[in-house]
Amino acid sequence: MLSKRWDTAGRWCIYALLLIVFVGPFWGIVATAFSGAPVKPGELLAWPHQFSLENFIFAWMDIGVWQYLLNSILVVFFGTVLQVSVSALAAYALARKKFRGVALVSLVILSTMMLPEEVIAISLYMIINWRLPLIDASLYNSYLGMILPVVGWAFSIFVLTEFMSAIPKELEEAARIDGANEWQIFFHVILPLVKPALGTVVTFGFIMIWDQYLLPLIVVNQDSLNTIPVILGTLRTDESITPNIFIAITLLAMLPSIIVYLGLQKHFNRGIMSGAVKG
C-alpha cells in the first residue's frame, strides 16, 4: 500500500516537472509581455510586476504591428487555401489516376523536400523579378510574390496522396455507376474521406506560411508589405524596443497559430493517428 502511494506521488512529481518544463517558457512570455516593469531572468515564472497593457498598446499603435499582422493574415489565408486546393488535386491525380510517368512525377515532387530554402533563394529572386508580359510587371513587392511560391508544397501533396491511395476503389466505381462525374467523385467521395488529412495539411501549411521569414525578405522591400516574422527580425536589433515590448509583439505573433491549432486539433490528431496506424 505504501509503495503504491510512493508510486503515485512519484508519478505526479514527474507530471509537475513536465508541466513546468513545457508551460514555464510560455508563462514567462506572458508574464514579460504584461509586465509594466523590466523582468529579470529569475522572475520569469513570477506574476507580472505592475500588470499593464502598455506594451501591447505601444506595439499596436506606435509600431503599427496591426498592419504586419494583417499582411501575414492575408498571405497565410490565400496561401493556405491555394496550397490545400492544389495539393488535393495533385494528390488525387497521383493516387487515383494511372498514367505514364506517375512514379517519376512523384519522385520529382518529393525531391523538392530535400532542398532547403537557402539553396533556391537566388533562383526564386530571379523568377519573382521577371516582368510578366501581359501586365508588364513583376511579382516583386506584392502579395502574390509571397503567396505563389508556397502554393506547391510537397509535404501536403505527399500526405494527401498517401491517404487517397488507401481509399478502396470500389467506392469510386460505385459512384461512377451511379452517374457521378470526375469532379463529383473528387468533392463528394474522396475529400470527405480524407478530412483528417486535410486538417493535418491545413495546420502544418498555416504554420509553415505564417513562420516564413526568408521568402518575404527576398521578395519584399517595402515596409508596408512586411509580415510579422520579418518585423520581429528587424525589431530584435532595435535598441529603442524594450524586451517587454518585443515579447508582447512575439505573443501577438503566436496567437493566430495557437488559435488555428486549437480549432483544427480534432482533425489534426485524427490525421496523425491515422497515419501512424497506416504506417
Feature map (PLM): residue ranges:
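A structural signal for multi-pass alpha-helical bundles of membrane permease subunits
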Residues: L2-G279
